[in-house]
């Protein structure tokens, strides 16, 4: 089992590139059945020395329409059959059937935006020994985008993540498999997400830290350019910043 430290040591870009295969992504940039568009995104990643690519086959934007397992698998298979490049691939899904299919097709990272609530997802992580991205989700949240009330968002997110880490470790996930993500934009209002990003250094402890703010509305509340935000994250100890790839 390779751990996070071993693969992060081979990367200098600090970027986890995002490729959406959905037709209704956050940003309308899906490339399902768009061979040339997909090829250009992968070439762009290669030219910019980006080693990590996050593949999403279903939208997670507010008000998103759910897709069937079959549709998500179809989109994933399109990518698997189209790709000829060598990257470290992450599967962005909260569907255990889709994730298992990705695992069987050489994906190395499981990125579950729902926070590993599903015990099947945890078992896949245990059995596969793959690296996981544990995304924060409020323990009382009933849906992905239910806005929760925080008194001290940085402190509470940190506590929730630590509690979830203990829980999944008790079920067999190894510490070296885990990276954490504060879930910016998910179940948090604009000011809470902005405060988390500004104070992201407070979340950096014993686990690799991954952050995704690319093209999200709350960054308008932060008086920094995209390049300054990226530098802020890297200087704060963030291991990977999720960024939408451009061609």
List PLM regions with ranges.
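Active-site-adjacent loop and "lid" segments of alpha/beta metabolic enzymes
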Residues: 2-4, 17, 25-38, 60-78, ...
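Hydrophobic/aromatic residues located in beta-strands of well-ordered beta-sheets
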Residues: 15, 89, 132, 178-180, ...
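Conserved, mostly hydrophobic/aromatic
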Residues: 19, 45, 49, 53, ...
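Phosphate/pyrophosphate-binding loops at sites that engage ATP/ADP/AMP, CoA/4′-phosphopantetheine
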Residues: 46, 50, 87, 162-177
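Acidic (Asp/Glu)-rich catalytic clusters
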Residues: 46-47, 103-104, 122-132, 172
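Short helix-capping segments at alpha-helix termini
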Residues: 84-86, 105-106, 170-173, 205-206
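Glycine/small-residue-rich loop that forms an oxyanion/phosphate-binding "nest" at active or ligand-binding sites
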Residues: 87-94, 100-103, 111-114
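The catalytic core of metal-dependent phosphodiesterases that act on cyclic dinucleotides
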Residues: 182-184
